[in-house]
């Protein structure tokens, strides 16, 4: 059992503008407040894969397995040879849009149900919500300002700063 964590943001931009930035190779370099670097491994019609290095040096690999042009995508993220978490990015709306990110974090999911529930409730969920809200604010900030988001723009994060 893996409990999801989900956050979304309303954007005063149409879905095409939002899709253009979230589907751009290396876009985390411009939009992600905790990204040190986002390097592309593959980025073509059928294959999308990149590497995200956080400000604190953690390196995670993102492998996109579902690409729904103009609407969103699904990917697995994790250390190169480690367990992966599932992430779903979804755009809804037309002239004004909503960007939603849902993460199914693998961390501590191998614990018994009670331990996992407690860890998820008091550690994973609040930490991931803070992280996801900062990431979403980064996209909004980039779309409004058309400049790269300053690092830790919305506050530091104990897992990634």
Predicted regions: what is each one?
Residues 1-43, 160-161:
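Hydrophobic ligand-binding cavity/cleft-lining segments
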Residues 4-6, 57-62, 83-88:
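Short, surface-exposed coil-to-beta transition loops
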Residues 12-16, 65-70, 90-100, 145:
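A short, structured loop/turn motif at beta-sheet edges
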Residues 17-22, 28, 64, 75, ...:
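Hydrophobic pocket/interface hotspot
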Residues 48-55, 74-80:
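Short beta-strand segments that buttress and anchor functional surface loops
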Residues 60-67, 71-83:
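Helix-adjacent hinge/juxtasegments
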Residues 79-134, 141, 150-152:
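Beta-strand/loop substructures that line and gate deep hydrophobic ligand-binding cavities in soluble
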């Amino acid at each position: 059992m893996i409990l999801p964590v989900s956050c979304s943001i309303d954007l005063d931009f149409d879905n095409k503008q939002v899709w253009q930035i979230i589907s751009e190779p290396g876009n985390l370099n411009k939009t992600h407040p905790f990204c040190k670097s986002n390097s592309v491994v593959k980025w073509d019609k059928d294959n999308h894969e990149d590497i995200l290095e956080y400000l604190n040096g953690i390196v995670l690999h993102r492998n996109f397995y579902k690409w729904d042009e103009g609407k969103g995508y699904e990917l697995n993220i994790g250390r190169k040879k480690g367990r992966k978490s599932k992430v779903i990015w979804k755009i809804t709306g037309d002239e004004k849009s909503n960007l939603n990110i849902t993460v199914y974090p693998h961390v501590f999911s191998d614990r018994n149900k009670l331990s996992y529930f407690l860890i998820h409730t008091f550690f994973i969920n609040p930490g991931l919500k803070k992280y996801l809200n900062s990431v979403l604010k980064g996209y909004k900030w980039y779309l409004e300002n058309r400049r790269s988001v300053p690092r830790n723009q919305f506050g530091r994060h104990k897992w990634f700063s």
